[in-house]
Amino acid sequence: MKEGSPLTISALPQVEYRQGTVVKHDGYEIIDHWFQVPLTHGLIFSKGRDAALSSRFADQSIKIFAREVINTSETLTLPVEKRPYIVYLQGGPGFGSPKTGSIGGWIAELAKTHRVILLDQRGTGMSSPLSARNITAVGDPQIQAEYVELFRADSIIADAEAIREVLLASRKDKRWSTIGQ
C-alpha cells in the first residue's frame, strides 16, 4: 500500500487456511500449513480493536507458514489424534523455524508425545517477508514505522492464536503448549 490516510473498516479480513504439501519420511509425517491473517490484528492486543480497524493497513492480510511434525511410529503409546499440540516460537532476530530435512534433537523428542508446530513468524522464513524492499514500498518513514510496528510480538501471538483456532477447531480441548528460544 502506498502513502495515504488511515481508513476505518467494519471488520478485519478473515483468516484463510490451506493445507500444503504432506510428506512422509523416516517415520514422520510433515505437513505444511498456509494461513492468510489480518495484517493489523495484533493491534487489538496492544492498542485495541479500534486501532486495528482504523489502521491504513486494516484491509490487508499477510501469509503465515507453519510446518507440523508428527511422529508416526506405531510403537508410541498415544495415538496421533490424541496428542496435544505444541508450537515452537523461534526467538530472534528474524529467523524462521528450524528446517525438517533431518529430524532429530528436541523436535524428535517432542514429536514422540506431541504434534509439533514450527511457526515461521510474520516477516521470517516462508511467511510474508519483512525486507527493506517491502518496508520502503509502503511510503514515507512515518508510514514505514506504522508498517514495521505490525511485526511485533503482539501480532505474532495473534497469528499463533488464529492458527490454533484453525488447527484445533475439531478438538474439544483447544489448548496447546508453547516452546521457544
Q: Predicted regions span which residues?
A:
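Catalytic-loop region of hydrolases
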Residues: 1-123, 133-134, 176
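Donor nucleotide-activated moiety binding/catalytic core segment of transferases
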Residues: 35, 151, 160
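Phosphate/oxyanion-binding active-site loops and adjacent basic polyanion-contact surfaces
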Residues: 58-62, 149-157
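Periplasmic/extracellular electron-transfer cofactor-ligation site
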Residues: 126
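Short, flexible, mixed-charge acidic loops at enzyme active sites
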Residues: 129-140
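Short glycine/proline- and acidic residue-enriched helix-loop micro-motifs
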Residues: 141-150
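Conserved acidic catalytic loop of the alpha/beta-hydrolase fold
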Residues: 146, 154-174
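Short beta-strand immediately N-terminal to the catalytic nucleophile in serine-hydrolase-like folds
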Residues: 178-180
